[in-house]
């Protein structure tokens, strides 16, 4: 016979809460404590803990603690990427843990694949044929209240595009990896060539909030910031001149082991053409 959790002593109730927070599934809790999954789910929801929906078992897994502490290149990079292009889905109106994900154009699928590998996700990569950016979209969406809470704690918020603020929980030795991830999500490395001459120039732009643009300018000690007149609360951080662009790329890439292939290849083009003491 199934037991009533509310009739259990407080110590057992706390053990159930702790078991769920340590990623024990509702099915495992049911077997261990003798309460039905539905009863456990309602108990946890009443305690403010979101639970998985449907039949109350987890279909896919990932490293739920990946963003708990930002202490490696990989974590700093992906936090920066999530700042730029990540999102959170809040399931506040029904049972179900919140979700987080990345959606990119298909020509950047390598980044989705790398993210999936970094967080050890078993979730499938899905395709969206809407072609809103001229090509198919690819996405990875994962569910975990623990991971979502850690992302929120690190500054990744729902609807963050207008309110994003500089990171406060990334140590100085890892900041350049964070910036590289942010660049891969919201930055552009552009190539310009005058029709009347052979000179090629490069520029870097980040599209973000005023607070983030100002932080980038102060952190990197170069570049300029200016507003996007057509989009509310949107600012650009811009770096021009081949040598300054090269300097910023060196800062982001010199000891890197993870990046978006498309932008890294553009950096290699810049490096091959202008190297250390060439260009303007």
Model segments located where?
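Internal intein/HINT superfamily modules and their associated LAGLIDADG
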Residues: 1-280
């Amino acid at each position: 016979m199934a037991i009533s959790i509310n009739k259990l002593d407080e110590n057992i109730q706390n053990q159930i809460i702790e078991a769920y927070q340590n990623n024990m599934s509702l099915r495992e809790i049911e077997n261990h404590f003798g309460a039905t999954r539905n009863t456990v789910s309602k108990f946890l929801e009443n305690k403010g803990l979101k639970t998985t929906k449907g039949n109350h078992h987890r279909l896919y897994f990932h490293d739920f603690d990946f963003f708990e502490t930002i202490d490696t290149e990989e974590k700093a990079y992906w936090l920066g990427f999530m700042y730029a292009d990540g999102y959170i889905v809040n399931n506040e109106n029904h049972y179900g843990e919140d979700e987080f994900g990345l959606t990119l154009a298909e020509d950047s699928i390598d980044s989705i694949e790398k993210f999936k590998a970094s967080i050890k996700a078993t979730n499938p990569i899905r395709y969206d044929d809407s072609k809103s950016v001229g090509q198919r979209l690819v996405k990875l969406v994962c569910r975990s209240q623990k991971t979502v809470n850690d992302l929120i704690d690190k500054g990744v918020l729902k609807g963050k595009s207008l309110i994003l603020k500089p990171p406060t929980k990334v140590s100085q030795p890892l900041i350049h990896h964070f910036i590289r991830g942010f660049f891969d999500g919201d930055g552009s490395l552009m190539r310009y060539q005058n029709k009347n001459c052979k000179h090629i120039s490069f520029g870097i732009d980040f599209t973000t909030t005023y607070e983030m643009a100002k932080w980038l300018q102060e952190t990197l000690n170069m570049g300029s910031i200016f507003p996007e007149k057509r989009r509310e609360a949107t600012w650009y951080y811009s770096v021009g001149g081949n040598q300054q662009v090269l300097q910023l790329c060196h800062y982001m890439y010199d000891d890197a082991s993870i990046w978006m292939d498309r932008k890294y290849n553009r950096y290699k083009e810049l490096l091959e053409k202008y190297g250390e003491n060439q260009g303007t």
